[in-house]
Amino acid sequence: MCIRDRYYVSRGWAGAAYCLTVFGVCFILARLLFISSISRFGGFTSAIACMSIETVGLVLLWLAPSTGYALIGAGLTGFGLSLVYPALGVEAIKQVPNSSRGAGLSAYAVFFDLALAIAGPLMGAVALNLGYTWIFFSAALLSVAGLGLTLLLKRRAMA
């Protein structure tokens, strides 16, 4: 049983698969419909907007009193998460000389993979010690931290 299912079971809810479906559909739709916003508004601005939406979604998942709220939270989280990786990737690659862009993109991808490798056990420990609901609170805090770092990087880039 995955964390999504255990979260639903811990709340006494049914239909956990719908939550993942809503997340996935919103993620894909946002990528398809708004990918051009990165070139239009810039990577930092797009990432800041998306992380803000993602954070709201995670907080809704944390506080959800019913499956309806959880579905809305999952949708917002999927929508928000969709453009963070490509938007920040655009900004990361801007910092690398043209001759090294392939290596720069590889390094960016490695750090994303490293973050995923750390997040799994970390969130597992949160679930084990605090309960499944607190995974979403912890993820929201990390999203706020990422938002703060992105704002800082945007200010530095504009200076």
Feature-to-residue mapping (PLM):
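Short, small-residue-biased leader/transition segments that mark boundaries at the very start
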Residues: M1-I3
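Loop-to-transmembrane helix entry
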Residues: V9-C26, A103
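Helix-to-loop junctions at the C-terminal end of transmembrane segments
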Residues: A30-G43, A127-L128
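Structural signature of the two symmetry-related core transmembrane helices
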Residues: T45-L60, F137-A140
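Short hydrophobic/alpha-helical segments at membrane-entry points of transmembrane helices
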Residues: G68-A74
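Intracellular juxtamembrane helix-capping segments at the cytosolic ends
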Residues: L83-V96
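Loop-to-transmembrane helix entry/capping segments in MFS-fold secondary transporters
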Residues: N98-Y108
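A membrane-interface helix-boundary motif in multi-pass transporters
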Residues: A125-L142
